[in-house]
Amino acid sequence: MNWIKKTLRFGEKIKTIIKARATKSEIANSDWTSCCKGPILKKDLEENLWVCPSCNKHHRISPHQRFDIIFGKNNYEVLKTPIPQDDPLNWNDAKPYKDRLRAARKKTGMDCGMMVVNTNIINLKITAIASDFDFIGGSIGAAEGEAFLYGIQHAIENEQPFVVFTSGGGMRMMESLISLSQMTRTTLAINELKKNNLPYIVVLTDPTAGGITASYAMLGDLHLAEPGALIAFAGARVIQGTVREELPVGFQRSEYVEKTGFVDLIVERKDLREKIGSLLSILLKKNSAINSSENETSEDSRTLTKAAS
């Protein structure tokens, strides 16, 4: 057999191996997924709130899954938010932006990458928002900005605390300056919320990065984070290329960020409901250890910290 035939046969073997690989849709529809120690049944992972029982990795989840876990199934009302015109810039790269939006909507069942709900937590009515990383990487465009502003407006009109679960890589490239302007809009909206003396709690989940970190994710009255969540502005390689120094291990993970003061508490997913409820009770001075205007001293601040722990 000459070398040409050997090459052709080798090529056929490669094709066979590639064909044998599972497709993205097959992986998504499989009963199995993988984590630290190999395959794990999705059913087992779901029963553990999508947290790996071996390594405690908090897997990414959709807004519906998150709200079901924290507020309970059928215990929240999804609010209809305004949806501006799709693709105002007629963006087209490897794939037209309108096609990307259609695919994201089909995949997630959402009109945009942010879900706003009216709900309650431990007998406190609140407005909550969560982003879906599966919707174009959780990036923020005009529609997501409108959803955020709608949530703030709803919270102010109903005098409710505002809780945000962040997840995403930043502002959406396909909307250029329209996307970047959402950083300003969300910041101004948060200022209005604070003028009305309404609590604003941010729960940082994996990943929270880019313009999200540089705007509404870091403006909360309190910042909670799930264990192991990536919290960053620029990527580690970009930073290392700029400073040209060895970076600390895990310096963009929630545990390290807590040590540097950007995160107040790291909370397990299973404990988020109780922790958010306790903190809101303290901030609103309802049935909590902090219940009078006298609690403004450093001693009382320690009481607040103890009650929240």
Regions flagged by a language model, labelled:
Residues 119-131, 147-171:
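A structural preference for short, pocket-lining loop segments at secondary-structure junctions
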Residues 112-116, 160-161, 198:
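Short glycine-rich loop/turn motifs
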Residues 102-103, 107-113, 138-153:
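Glycine-rich anion/phosphate-binding loops
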Residues 169-288:
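Conserved catalytic cores of soluble enzyme domains
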Residues 133, 137-149, 157, 168, ...:
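Conserved mixed alpha/beta catalytic, RNA-binding, or beta-rich assembly cores of soluble enzyme
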Residues 1-110, 121, 279-309:
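Intrinsically disordered, low-complexity segments enriched in small/flexible residues
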Residues 35, 101, 130-139:
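Short, basic, glycine/proline-bearing loop/turn elements
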Residues 43, 131, 165, 203-204:
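Structural motif
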